[in-house]
Amino acid sequence: MCGIVGFVGEANGVKFLIDGLSSLEYRGYDSAGIAGVVNGEASVTKSVGRIKNLEALIPEGLHLELGIGHTRWATHGGVNTTNSHPHQSFNKRFILVHNGVIENFQELKERFFKGVELVSETDTEVIVQLVQVYSDRSLDTKEAFKKAVSKLQGSYALCLIDTEDKDTLYVAKNKSPLLIGLGEENKNYVGSDALAMIKYTNNFLEINDGEFVIVKKDSITIEDKEGNVVERESFSTNLNAGEIDKGIHEHYMIKEIHEQVGAMRNIISHYFDGHDVNINSEIINNVKDADRLYIIGCGTSYNAGLVGRNYFEKWAGIPTEVHLASEFAYNVPLLSKKPMFIFLSQSGETADLRAVLTKLRSVNADYKFLVLTNVDASTLSRECDYTLLLHAGVEIAVASTKAYTAQIATLSILAYEVAKQLSRQPKFDIEQELSVITSAIESILDDTKTIKDLAKNLFTERNAFYIGRGIDYYSACEAALKLKEVSYIQTEGFAGGELKHGTIALIEERTPVVALITSAKLDLNTRSNVSEVASRGANTLIITLEKLARKGDYAIPNVNEDLAPIASIVVTQLFAYYAAYTKGLDVDKPRNLAKSVTVE
């Protein structure tokens, strides 16, 4: 969940290191650091907090033609400069950055450094000290690095500098994302993802698990575990460096909420040809022929999967289960005879999903996997059989907004076409209905002042609740997640009918309770739940469709009830943003969170 960068070339790499880390700050922002070689000696600068804190400490005029950098999300050891990366060997010769978790680092400490006090509390320091151990046994740097890596169990993306070799980065990878960026004019780059390097290159090399890479300014050498040189074609991405800019917006989160209109239009443009759905027929056939679908995701993606299940079961008649990736790999349910697996991951790097993929491939190599992701060059898009891109554009704020609505929209298109192929096509035109949804989102975004005022008046307490029934219950879960992660208000999403079974005991005077009602048949039932909590002092609000609205409700334009979660959730996203903004919180980077969860 950390981010790493590296540079080697005939130029000063300091600006790239800072730019790259800034682009990776969504992965972790407890601390940061850069290091390189100056006059044959290590130059290391580290700080606690954001990249701007690090930048302020960098010596004026620092020139690095070989450098590495790291932004940290703490997994081993407290948040301080001692534990922040880069880490150095005892003799100061070797410097290392690492993303991942070394599962056997305590065992390695006992075996190699018993009685020796290491500098930090991290698992990473053990690696760089191991490199020195093997270097002291007369191995050259490449072999010492390989030997050290061979002792590791767990996940890692590593980038090593030898201060006695100012022309080389040593790189290794296992179960943690890492790319090589091919520069021009004798410059090459390393980064946790393409976003870190997109301002400098859009030409990348994939690194597979177990491979080692020697990166020089004018050459890249990839070796497999046996030391054989591997030839590999480079690739480019659909990333646009301009998307990284906040533009007129104060935060990425509000920018990305507003970008949902454009994202919906992109989805419609990419997945429809005329009025026909434009999705690879192999994907359609694999989903259509499955006897059960397994949608798997984490956090917001899991919530999107809950909505998607409704489409596959209601429209296509295919039994569908939704599972948390973090549980699935270690508690695999009884699988059907002909399953199809659908992964949801904004980044395409989610470690828990990769663990599920590995587990299921070991069960049956013939299983088929589809991933819905926002990043075309991601690990999961390369490792799964099929990919459907979300076409939502770069999402940088830790709290996902436009990727969530894009996931639901894409799932709805897929389910609709599968239903059509099974002669169960719903009695509406989904392209037309998604266009109506897009207009509804635009209308909601035109009313942000009202929504901002509602948020200020509603979310004044320490606890809050969202409730809903049917498909609105899933929206309530996502709305609650969004509010808690950015505003730090303890928020839960509940099925309206479950309030009486325990949760209503938590209702106090002025406790905010927001109900989502986008189904006519569930309108009265949910309003009854709202009355129950209001009579106990709750501060209540109903978000509903115009056709169902009563005095005091917040009404959104009428849309297809099955697809309504794509529109209604936008109101709750704005609630979350303004609740956090009003409290003066860092909306884009909530405490303790990282956007791309690359460790299990």
Predicted features along the sequence, with ranges:
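Active-site phosphate/pyrophosphate-binding segments
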Residues: 260-264, 268-294, 386-512, 583-600
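Acidic/histidine-rich
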Residues: 152-187, 459-485, 520-522, 527
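Glycine-rich phosphate-binding loops that contact phosphosugars or nucleotide phosphates
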Residues: 288-433, 469, 516-562, 575
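Conserved short alpha-helical segments that host acidic/polar catalytic motifs at enzyme active sites
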Residues: 1-246, 250, 265-266, 277-289, ...
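Short, glycine-/Ser/Thr-/acidic-enriched flexible segments
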Residues: 9-13, 39-41, 49-50, 73-75, ...
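Glycine-rich oxoanion-binding loops at beta->alpha junctions
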Residues: 65-82, 273-285, 308-309, 313-344, ...
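Short helix-capping/linker segments at secondary-structure and domain boundaries
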Residues: 12-13, 133-139, 166, 186, ...
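Generic C-terminus detector
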Residues: 558-600
